[in-house]
A protein has these predicted regions:
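A glycine-rich beta-to-alpha transition motif near the start of alpha/beta enzyme domains, typified by
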Residues: 1-379
């Protein structure tokens, strides 16, 4: 096709996200040319992404770039990117845990890892954070098992359980679990208010604030922001960009990445109604949390953000620790409640000479949707 280049694409859901899984050796080696190709594939910049495969939603405008790894401790190298919707940018600052779940399945599908029954462990080196993730993928007849009876909130139906272990997730971007060395810091908002926050870096950096300190219950659903005149989103973005500077991730608020750090609003366990109308009982959860997905509120919750939230909740003295259940503190298992429901984390946390996270575990599902050829503008 004149003017266009053919590239192989696998389109896959990973957790509560969705995106294209691309082979690194089929993309331009020049980063700028590579990003132009990815933007063209997704139909960006355009709020509808009508001329590409993007779904006009931050949770479906994601990309994974994968290749076999030369590292002794990894089978594949995996780079995650947020593909801008209205903006012509691909942001590689942080990782996506949901898309990571699909990376393990993709590696087996492509033959990068020998399929071992009944479970294949895929060692994934995430280039965004320079951390290794183990994906435990069920296998049958030499192929990943997709069907199963494991359900995750935010995705209809059930699938095969894929367990992810994020190894040594602390200091993913800043080099420190507590980037400022403090369990709490004070920041001043643009409107002059001062609030307490906690800055934590585990799997991805995040800043935590109590919902009650901002005047909210913490159980608000994403649709709430459509009627409040942008107050909540603007306040959270003010907190997020201020934290980016404090964590050394940006020289100024204006220069902060749109994706990193995460900003998370936390509150104590309480009963609420999820987006699908189900009642989430307060006694079944350990913490309630809400987070942003770029310029909107997340419809569920980021896996890496969840790992950071669960970790923060178990570090004595953080704002998240002040609202998490006593049960979680005793077991190091955290059930986090989000707009679409809840999910569970297991955090191996020690405090011998400072706080240290050995690994963090979470379960997801993934589903390959399509594998074929995409047409993108050639250069």
């Amino acid at each position: 096709m004149n003017g266009y280049k053919e590239i192989p694409v696998t389109y896959m859901r990973g957790g509560t996200s969705k995106g294209a899984y691309l082979l690194q050796d089929t993309l331009p080696t020049d980063p700028a040319a590579r990003d132009r190709m990815i933007l063209d594939l997704y139909g960006s910049p355009d709020v509808r992404q009508i001329n590409g495969i993007g779904g006009a939603d931050p949770l479906t405008s994601k990309v994974a770039i994968v290749n076999p790894s030369d590292r002794d401790d990894a089978d594949i190298d995996y780079t995650f990117g947020y593909v801008g919707i209205a903006d012509a940018v691909v942001d590689y600052e942080g990782n996506c845990g949901n898309i990571s779940a699909g990376a393990g399945v993709f590696a087996i599908m492509e033959g990068f890892v020998k399929a071992v029954e009944p479970e294949t462990v895929v060692r994934i080196f995430n280039t965004n954070t320079n951390k290794v993730i183990e994906a435990h993928v069920p296998v049958r007849d030499g192929k990943p098992v997709i069907d199963g009876d494991f359900a995750i909130d935010g995705v209809p139906g059930t699938g095969a359980r894929i367990t992810l272990y994020f190894l040594e997730p602390g200091g993913s971007k800043t080099g420190k679990l507590l980037p400022t060395g403090n369990v709490q810091d004070t920041i001043t908002l643009a409107d002059g208010r001062t609030i307490q926050v906690s800055l934590v870096d585990a799997a991805n950096p995040a800043v935590f604030v109590k919902a009650t300190d901002l005047g909210y219950e913490g159980t608000e659903l994403p649709a709430f922001t459509e009627t409040d005149g942008g107050v909540l989103l603007n306040t959270l973005e003010d907190i997020r960009t201020t934290a980016a500077v404090m964590m050394g991730l940006a020289p100024s608020k204006e220069a902060a990445s749109p994706a990193v750090p995460k900003v998370c609003m936390v509150s104590a366990p309480q009963t609420y109604v999820a987006s699908d109308g189900r009642t989430i009982e307060g006694n079944s959860i350990d913490i309630v949390a809400r987070t942003k997905a770029l310029a909107v509120m997340h419809k569920a919750y980021a896996v890496t953000g969840g790992i950071c939230t669960a970790t923060a909740a178990l570090i004595t003295g953080t704002v998240a620790n002040e609202v998490v259940s006593e049960r979680a503190k005793e077991t190091n298992r955290v059930t986090l409640a989000h707009p679409s429901g809840k999910f569970d984390f297991e955090i191996c946390l020690t405090h011998d000479e400072g706080w240290h996270v050995e690994k963090a575990g979470v379960a997801r599902t993934a589903r390959p949707i399509m594998k074929g050829i995409a047409y993108v503008k050639g250069e």
